[in-house]
């Protein structure tokens, strides 16, 4: 992504049958609060939890990143926490307020989400945002982080709670799915 004084732009360049193509996604510089977005109060309660795994799911363009940015902003304004974001690319840039926030970009600061998440466990964050949980390694490490006292946020591209659970379990071999199901229910 690239920053300009009034907006950040996520740029994807690609080649196609008819030649090069460009996709631009505008990311506002100002992070809207949960109140401004009129998000349910339960999200504030979840953001205030000391540990756990919070998955924000939905199709492309449904507001997953905006919702997570608002939740991280709430923590930053109301809690004294060490927050680490791992994104590809970094979308919403938070300035530290009551919390210390550090951003890591996949491809620039780390090779993969999994590598950054594994390293994060040694960096003593309280809150970890994983921009997108794409594979079993990343999900396993996110579950481990949540079980060892971190508050972990992540996104998945699914359309319902049932599809989310199916997708999560489907990332694991059948012999591991019962264990993962128990981990998710804790």
Show where each model-derived region lies.
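Short, flexible helix-loop junctions that flank or precede catalytic/ligand sites
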Residues: 1-186
